[in-house]
Amino acid sequence: MISKTVVEALEHFLPAENIYINEPMSKHTTFRIGGEADCFLQIENMEQLKKIQRYLQQLEIPYFVLGNGSNLLVGDQGYRGVIIEIADKMNEVRVMGSLIVAQAGAPMSKIARVACENALKGFEFAAGIPGTIGGGVVMNAGAYGGELKQVVTMVKVVDREGNVLELDNATMEFGYRTSAIKRLPFTVAEVHIQLAAGVREEIKARMEELAARRREKQPLEYPSAGSTFKRPQGYFAGELIMKAGLQGYQIGGAQVSEKHCGFVINKDNATAGDVKELISYVQSTVKSQFGVELEPEVIMI
């Protein structure tokens, strides 16, 4: 529970209309699942982010920084602390020659559109990834042979004390669905993306081709957090799950997608408990049949 004193203090940092108490997180995740957060803030700029993180850190109040809620499962009990949401208002994208500078809340789809409009190639792979660039760099998001580590040159982050740091590509230590930020207490504020000059029509055609492949193979018609499991070395998670006979397997309202077994979907008003139980069952079944450990890609809070 967040006290009235804390809420009043937060009103010094951002407008009162950007502060929500007991906010249902099901409204803010692509899974459409999640209980209430004690306090939900919509951040507009880096200065607000710096001041609020510093304040919450001083009071030792737990907080979680949220993009657009993809790749995330919030528990049925909600979140005891403060959710800092950046996607709604902190999402500016600027073009400086062949360099794109994006605020952390900018959707990767928006960055891809801006790149295409400016005839910049190299970001087409990310056009359909359902997340913000801030969350994307933390996970080193990728698809169709591309990864953010290939185009990100610098990441501006805010530490818990409100200091701004600049991390270059090497310092980010990008790996498969990971980066240095996953283990460091930093919040992504801004990302620099270096692209190359291209032909607008060719870039658009490539984006449309990848979008068609997504629509054909992924269950975009249902709420989900995107791909549920990381790819185990030497295997494909969806293929193992299908071979284990789990295609369409359902617990409560959560289901292993019939369209793509690598996705757990919210088929019918699923709870977080349903999803967690289904993920656990899939993991144990695949482990017992094939000896392969499936690691969830979805973040759970």
What is each PLM-predicted segment?
Residues 1, 5, 26, 44-47, ...:
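Conserved active-site and cofactor/substrate-binding residues in soluble primary-metabolism enzymes
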Residues 20-21, 72, 158-285, 289-301:
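Phosphate/pyrophosphate- and phosphate-bearing ligand-binding catalytic cores of soluble enzymes
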Residues 59, 66-68, 151, 222-223, ...:
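Short, basic and Ser/Thr-rich N-terminal targeting/leader segments
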Residues 121, 151, 170-172:
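Short beta-strand or tight-loop elements
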Residues 134-136, 140-144, 205-210:
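An N-terminal domain-start capping segment
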